[in-house]
């Protein structure tokens, strides 16, 4: 994590969806917000079989891979709900893990905007690493994870 001006650049670490944390959602237990997010994706499309496989995933990477195999996937439908599903995953992550919530509520982060500085993801991130982000700000990707984190923190 690197704070520059009003931006909190992150990729990996405790803000990442791959960060290990215990989340209980319904009667199910998840090992990361990525696993919960992919589970919610599978359920959205009625793919219970893949949802069950995601539940058994040992790593966030495995859950993400399974999430790409969801049957009946429809991009238009997913685009309408994916931010809501991400919000639920983040809410579970932070509300159920006091250590992470304490970090998120750090006053040093007040008034700042979260930016996922992933050079590989222009949807959930900006498509640039933190060292090249500012000089390319006009070309950033959507940063949906950063925006959702910023919104979630603002709701606390």
Residue ranges and their predicted role:
Residues 1-156:
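Charged, low-complexity intrinsically disordered segments
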């Amino acid at each position: 994590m690197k704070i520059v001006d009003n931006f909190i650049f992150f990729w990996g670490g405790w803000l990442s969806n791959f960060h290990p944390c215990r989340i209980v959602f319904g009667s199910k237990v998840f090992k990361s917000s990525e696993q919960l997010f992919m589970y919610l994706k599978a359920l959205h499309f009625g793919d219970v079989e893949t949802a069950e496989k995601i539940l058994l995933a040992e790593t966030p990477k495995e859950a993400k891979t399974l999430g790409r195999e969801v049957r009946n996937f429809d991009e238009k439908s997913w685009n309408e709900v994916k931010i809501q599903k991400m919000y639920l995953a983040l809410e579970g992550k932070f509300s159920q893990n006091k250590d992470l919530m304490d970090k998120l509520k750090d006053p040093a982060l007040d008034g700042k905007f979260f930016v996922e500085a992933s050079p590989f993801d222009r949807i959930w991130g900006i498509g640039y690493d933190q060292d090249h982000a500012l000089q390319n700000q006009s070309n950033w990707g959507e940063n949906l994870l950063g925006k959702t984190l910023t919104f979630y923190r603002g709701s606390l």
